[in-house]
């Protein structure tokens, strides 16, 4: 293969694999720089350890913001420098239908979790009751304040995994490779969570990555996957009282309390539904629903931003 073809595609742009490599390295550097700056700030201003702060709810929010900021800065830079794209191409533009996509995604995410919970009830593994141990005020605060927390967390992960990495492979006509290369790291990133059931957890989280990638591809924006992602977590933790990817500290006074009688292969045990078969079934159905439904479609503007770069280049030359 000629050096020209090894590095550049027929549109004269750096190939998608090299673009992804640049994004990954730049993201790691920028995220580390932001992390170092925050560590200094915590020690000087808060007079405490960075580790202690990051384990708190406030620290969780800060980590989500760092993830989002680093992925957004690097994604915008790669898009602008490597592909001549505006910041709107990353998928957060208030394009026509963005609010509808966010709302539909929120409904889809919440309903999908409820379906998984119903499977757990039908299998006699999950038993729900109202949380009588918590006051209405505490429950209300949990429902209210965890919503923006889960939105921030989902925004960071969507920006990183369904942002520039997936989008640049889509423009290179390597969509399925992009789905693979974003869904598996997305799953691997959750393996450090508490109470992981490694095989099932990885498989289910990878399936969730495919689901969220499908949501992006159907609309070519991040509003639909954001809606799905945050509502899935919020419904699971704040409403149903289930562990969210093994984490329970984020929703201290959920609306419902759950008794998990297992078996763990069905319900996920201490990791929550995402470690069990009820989640696998719900995700498979949700993927088909999002991919096959006819009422999800991208705006012309967002479709153009992820158009085939080679075909687009030929069109410009021909014009």
What is each of the regions a protein language model found here?
Residues 1-94, 98, 237-319:
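N-terminal, membrane-interfacial amphipathic/helix-forming hydrophobic leader that caps
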Residues 10, 156-181, 214-221:
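Membrane-interface helix/loop boundary segments of multi-pass membrane proteins
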Residues 21-25, 61-62, 102-107, 143-144, ...:
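Hydrophobic alpha-helical transmembrane segments
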Residues 38-62, 83-159, 166-171, 302-306, ...:
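Juxtamembrane helix-loop-helix connectors linking adjacent transmembrane helices
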Residues 65-70, 140-147, 160, 203-207, ...:
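Membrane-embedded alpha-helical segments of multi-pass membrane proteins
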Residues 113, 150-151, 174-191, 205-209:
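Small-polar-interrupted transmembrane alpha-helices in polytopic inner-membrane proteins
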Residues 190-199:
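Membrane-interface helix caps and helix-loop-helix hairpins in membrane proteins
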Residues 201-265:
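Functionally important transmembrane alpha-helices
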């Amino acid at each position: 293969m000629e050096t020209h073809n090894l590095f550049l595609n027929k549109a004269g742009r750096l190939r998608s694999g090299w673009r992804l490599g640049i994004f990954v390295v730049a993201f790691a550097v920028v995220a580390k720089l932001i992390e170092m700056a925050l560590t200094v700030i915590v020690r000087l201003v808060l007079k405490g350890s960075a580790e202690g702060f990051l384990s708190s709810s406030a620290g969780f929010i800060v980590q989500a913001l760092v993830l989002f900021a680093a992925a957004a800065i690097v994604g915008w830079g790669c898009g602008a420098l490597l592909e001549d794209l505006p910041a709107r191409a990353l998928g957060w533009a208030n394009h026509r239908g963005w609010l509808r996509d966010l709302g539909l995604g929120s409904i889809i995410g919440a309903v999908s979790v409820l379906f998984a919970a119903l499977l757990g009830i039908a299998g006699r593994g999950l038993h729900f009751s109202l949380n009588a141990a918590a006051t209405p005020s505490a429950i209300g605060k949990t429902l209210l304040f965890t919503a923006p927390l889960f939105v921030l967390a989902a925004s960071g992960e969507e920006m990183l995994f369904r942002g520039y990495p997936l989008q640049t492979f889509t423009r290179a006509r390597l969509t399925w490779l992009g789905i693979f290369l974003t869904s598996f790291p997305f799953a691997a990133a959750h393996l450090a969570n508490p109470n992981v059931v490694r095989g099932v957890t990885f498989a289910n989280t990878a399936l969730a990555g495919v689901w969220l990638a499908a949501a992006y591809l159907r609309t070519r924006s991040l509003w639909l996957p954001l809606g799905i992602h945050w509502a899935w977590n919020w419904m699971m933790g704040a409403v149903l009282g289930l562990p969210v990817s093994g984490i329970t500290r984020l929703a201290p006074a959920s609306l419902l309390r759950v008794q998990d009688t297992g078996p763990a292969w069905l319900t996920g045990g201490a990791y929550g539904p995402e470690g069990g078969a009820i989640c696998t079934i719900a995700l498979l159905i949700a993927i088909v629903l999002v991919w096959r439904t006819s009422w999800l479609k991208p705006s012309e503007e967002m479709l153009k931003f992820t158009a085939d770069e080679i075909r687009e280049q030929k069109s410009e030359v021909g014009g």
